[in-house]
Amino acid sequence: MSTNGWFLLIGMLMLARGFAATTISRSPFTSAIVYLAVGILLGPSCLNLFRFDPTKESALLEMLAQAALLISLFSAGVKMPVPFNLARWNAPLRLAWVSMTLTVGLVALFAYYVLHLPAGAAILLGGILAPTDPVLATDVQVRHAGDKDELRFNLTCEAGMNDGSAFPFVLLGLGMLHMDDMSDVATHLAQWLSVDVLWSTAGALLIGGGCGAAVARIGWQLRVVKPRHEIMDDLVALGLIAIVFSVASLVKASGFLAVFFAAVALRQTELKLAGAPKDRHGLREPELAKSQVAQDSATNDVPQVVSAESLVFKEHLERLSELTLVLLLGGMISLRELPYETIGVAAFLFVVARPLAVYVGLMGSGTGKRMRGMIGWFGVRGIGSIFYLVFAMQAGLPPALAKQLTGISLGVIMLSILVHGFSVKPLIDDAK
């Protein structure tokens, strides 16, 4: 497809999505299903007007998926409730690390014993398919910074962290595939645990939390000086994302976790500096903070601004990323060439691995059975899985294995968008 054709197609989809926003919100399916259907219709499965080869275009696809993830992770982070409370974050922390690890292990066992993949490839497939997606899960995400829905909070917070917590398993699988001398496994595992797991997480927390809090304080100080300084919130947020991700990556910490923690720290620090009042649950009210800002500005007092413009801007970029990448997904898939193992892997992941991992991970957390069941079902796979797939390709997968993992992964992502996309609205409405 020509450049003009791409502009025309994406422009028409954007117009249609914009005009049909109310219709789609009332329909039983998500916007991602619409984009996927258009991609499949125009792609190699039907009209064959375009084909996007993830193997040949892995570098471009990696960049697009990475940008979409970073924007989505930042948007999720600034919606987290303030102040941070370990008891409230207990469930998502368990989901992001305990349930994530169990999901990787279960998928790896299935791939090893049923699909007969090598151990390294089995772990790699588990790392690719285990993380839930922050980009495509907008219908079950926290809708705004003051949203107190427990299900949405758990799912959003989990998705914000588990893209980073899955990365060590992708590295472990790749390391095992490229390991020539199996006698040195203990040394490699020790290095993996100390650097790729422990330091990656701790470094991300330190870098992201420190940078987010520092930017919030700098912005607040600039706003309280006279004459008052205007701040371009969108550029500040994008700059924070870029700096935090690059610094974390340079020191081998998790860039995805660092960006999420930076957004959380930014919002936490801003609301505390603004003196936002607390509700009966002890959470600060961002809307009340905005009202106070308006009153202060009207009386020329010191403005204690907590800006929402950057969040709005990121959500617009998030929608554009979703449209583009899901459309490309449709162009990557040929329904006639999907591996036969795809349905088995998807069924095992959706019905066995994810629910079981969530149930075990939340044992003793005080989370009710109904809530655990809902969380166990809502785990859409999407852009994060695409990123880790093409990351593995860039790391040098053997061609035959790359083709097999690509077919399985893209097929599972497609089925996840369809199955979870059709079930999310009825189940969310039923849970209210």
Named regions from a protein language model:
Residues 1-432:
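Transmembrane helical cores of multi-pass secondary ion antiporters/exchangers
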